[in-house]
Amino acid sequence: MTASTALWAQGPNIEELFKKAGAASDANEPKARQYLYREYKVTNEINEKGESSNRHTETWEAIGLEGSEYRKLVQRDDKPLREKEQKQEDEKLRKETDRRRQEKKGGIKNPLKRSYSFGYTKGDERFFDFRYVGEEVVNGRPAYVLEGKPKSDVKPTNNHEKQLLLSRLKLWIDEEEFFESNFEIEVTGAGVDIRPGTMVAFKQQRMEDGTWLMNEMRVRFILKPLRIANVRMEVLTTRSDFHKFAVDSRILERQ
C-alpha cells in the first residue's frame, strides 16, 4: 500500500473538513437570504400504539416584504383559510408591512430571518468525537459521511450542551463544495423531559447558481413533561418553488 493510498483509507482530515464546512456555510448564508419558497408542514400526534391520533397540515408562503422575508399562512389541512382566519392573516400582514416601513424610515434594515432551529449550531462539533465512515452520493453528488458521539470528558454548562451530550450526530459534507448537505441528530440518553428517539434531520438542495437551501426537515419529539406520560409528535416540513427576490421585493426568477 502506498502512502497516498493509506492516507485515503484513513479518510479526510476531520478538523480541516469542519473548517472548510464552516467557511462554506458563512459564504452561503447571504446567498440563501435571497430566496423565497413555499412550505408544507405535516404534523402527526402519535399515540402509545404508534398510530396517528391527530394529523394536520399547514401551507405557508415565504414572500418578500419591504426587502426581507415574511411567512404567510395560506392553507390549513389542504384547504383555504376560513374567512375569519384569513382576515386575521391579512391584518398581520398589514401591521407587519407598516412596521417594516417605519423601520426603513428610521434607517433600520431588517435582515432575513429563518424560523427553524436544529438544536445544533456552528461550533457544537467541539462536544463530539467524530469518525469518518465512508462516502455516499447525495442528490447525485459525492459526500463525506461523519458520525459523532458525545465526548466523555466534557461537562455541560447549560441545557443546550446537556442536550448535545445526550445525542449522536451524523453529517454528510459535499466533497466538492464542503457544504453540509444532510444532517441528523438523535437523542440517545434520557434527559429531564426529552426522551431517547427524539430526532431532527434535514436535507439541503443545491440551486443552479450554487446556493444551498434546506428543502426537507423531519422532526420527531418524544417528551415526558413533568415525568407523567410520553408525548410523541412527528413533523415533516418540505420547501419547494424556490425563487429569488430583490431588495424591493420584486420576484426575479424561479427554480
Where are these regions (language model features)?
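N-terminal signal peptide c-region/cleavage motif recognized by signal peptidases
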Residues: 3-4
